[in-house]
């Protein structure tokens, strides 16, 4: 196994499909597709591509740190008590442990992510 992994967005394989947990759904009927590309250690560090259709959900990061780059689409993230922040293709951000707020997908979004638990 190589220690160098290239992300080939055209050959990501079959995604894991899911829906938000009912207690996290605020509006709409979003669906998710996740392509996990690589994991390290005991899955403490993971990376992949995630896609979501329009809707609003509660985002609770807990102890997870997540780095994201939006590949396509538009989202608005609002931390509880904070100002809404809009992100679209090319934007990069980090959700730190303890983040609690809303994730609103305005246009089907696809992001590249790295999560550390």
Model regions and ranges:
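A short, N-terminal "cap"/entry segment at the start of jelly-roll beta-barrel domains
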Residues: 1-44
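Short, conserved beta-strand element in jelly-roll/cupin
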Residues: 52, 62-77
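A short hydrophobic beta-strand segment most commonly corresponding to one strand
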Residues: 94, 107-117
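Short histidine-centered beta-strand/loop micro-motifs
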Residues: 17, 48-49, 57-62, 79, ...
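Short acidic-glycine-tyrosine-enriched beta hairpin
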Residues: 81-98
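Conserved short histidine dyad/triad with adjacent acidic residue
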Residues: 39, 43-62, 96-97
């Amino acid at each position: 196994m190589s220690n160098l992994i290239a992300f080939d967005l055209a050959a990501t394989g079959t995604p894991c499909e899911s829906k938000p947990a009912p207690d996290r759904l605020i509006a709409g009927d979003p669906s998710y597709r996740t392509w996990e590309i690589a994991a390290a250690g005991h899955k403490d560090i993971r990376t992949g591509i995630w896609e979501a259709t329009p809707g609003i959900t509660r985002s609770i990061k807990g102890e997870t740190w997540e780095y994201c780059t939006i590949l396509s689409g538009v989202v608005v993230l609002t931390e509880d008590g904070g100002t809404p922040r809009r992100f679209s293709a090319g934007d990069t951000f980090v959700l730190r442990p303890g983040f609690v707020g809303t994730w609103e997908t305005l246009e089907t979004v696809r992001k590249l992510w790295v999560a550390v638990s």
